[in-house]
Swiss-Prot record:
Glycans are attached at residue 229. Induction: Positively regulated by cell integrity signaling through MPK1 in response to cell wall perturbation. Induction is dependent on transcription factor RLM1. Expression is also up-regulated 7-fold upon exposure to polyhexamethylene biguanide (PHMB). Present with 688 molecules/cell in log phase SD medium. A lipid is attached at residue 232 (GPI-anchor amidated asparagine). Cell wall biogenesis protein that participates in the organization of the beta-glucan assembly. Involved in the mechanism responsible for cell tolerance to polyhexamethylene biguanide (PHMB), an antifungal agent. GO terms for cellular component: cellular bud neck; fungal-type cell wall; fungal-type vacuole; plasma membrane; side of membrane. It comes from Saccharomyces cerevisiae (strain ATCC 204508 / S288c). This is Cell wall biogenesis protein NCW2. Residues 43-57 have a biased composition (Polar residues). GO terms for biological process: chitin localization; fungal-type cell wall organization. Keywords: Cell membrane, Cell wall biogenesis/degradation, Glycoprotein, GPI-anchor, Lipoprotein, Membrane, Signal.
Length: 254
């Protein structure tokens, strides 16, 4: 009888302990659930705040791309010639500033011609003709230097040289006439026709402008001689010599 009482008491004690354990487990489970719920509630506001900040950043960046009020033309060294504002289908505005490019010289070649007609030819039975050409060189510096500043403030320098002139003898003739049997003073005339070219070149950057002027010049040289065909027939050769001398005078006059 006593043993049964002890066994019954033990069973009651075990049942009470198991009940307390189940209650504790339920409480722990409830506390864990509440903690997880609390953690979830703490994470959610943080994520929303980050999303709001990100969206705000994107919007502000987009606005800065379309703002044009803070652009002032006088911040440029040279103000724009014109401004073009374009708005696309999405409402974005693009501002484009345009400047006129500075003028540039194109290659130009100009030729002018002037001529002088030969004068005073004398006919004769003796004619001496010759042709020659002369070329001169010059080591002079440029004649002038032109400095130009365009609308952008850039400076261009143009240097001008006079190139050497060239003289070419087109025709040289000498003639004389004498009266047979008497003394006379015939004249020997020399005609020198030269073509003279004067050229100057202007350079500006990679552009070259050339101006060429061509003209003809005539020089008449006269040489007087005294001869007598009745006394010395050898004088016939002196006409040629005088003709050559006249040519030399004409060349010097150039």
């Amino acid at each position: 009888m006593k043993a049964c009482s002890i066994l019954f008491t033990t069973l009651i004690t075990l049942a009470a302990a198991q009940k307390d354990s189940g209650s504790l487990d339920g409480q722990n489970s409830e506390d864990s659930s509440q903690k997880e719920s609390s953690n979830s509630q703490e994470i959610t506001p943080t994520t929303t705040k980050e999303a709001q900040e990100s969206a705000s950043t994107v919007v502000s960046t987009g606005k800065s791309l379309v703002q044009t009020s803070n652009v002032v033309s006088n911040t440029y060294a040279v103000a724009p010639s014109t401004t073009v504002v374009t708005t696309d289908a999405q409402g974005k505005t693009t501002t484009q500033y345009l400047w006129w490019v500075a003028e540039s010289n194109s290659a130009v070649s100009t030729t002018s011609t002037a001529s002088v007609q030969p004068t005073g030819e004398t006919s004769s039975g003796i004619t001496n003709s010759a042709s020659s050409s002369t070329t001169s060189t010059s080591t002079d510096g440029p004649v002038t230097i032109v400095t130009t500043t365009n609308s952008l403030g850039e400076t261009y320098t143009s240097t001008v040289w006079w190139l050497p002139s060239s003289a070419t003898t087109d025709n040289t003739a000498s003639s004389s006439k004498s009266s047979s049997g008497s003394s006379s003073k015939p004249e020997s005339s020399t005609k020198v026709v030269s073509t003279i070219k004067s050229t100057y070149t202007t350079t500006s950057g990679s552009t070259v402008e050339t101006l060429t002027t061509t003209y003809k010049s005539t020089v008449n040289g006269k040489v007087a001689s005294v001869m007598s065909n009745s006394t010395n027939g050898a004088f016939a050769g002196t006409h040629i010599a005088y003709g050559a001398g006249a040519f030399a005078v004409g060349a010097l006059l150039l």
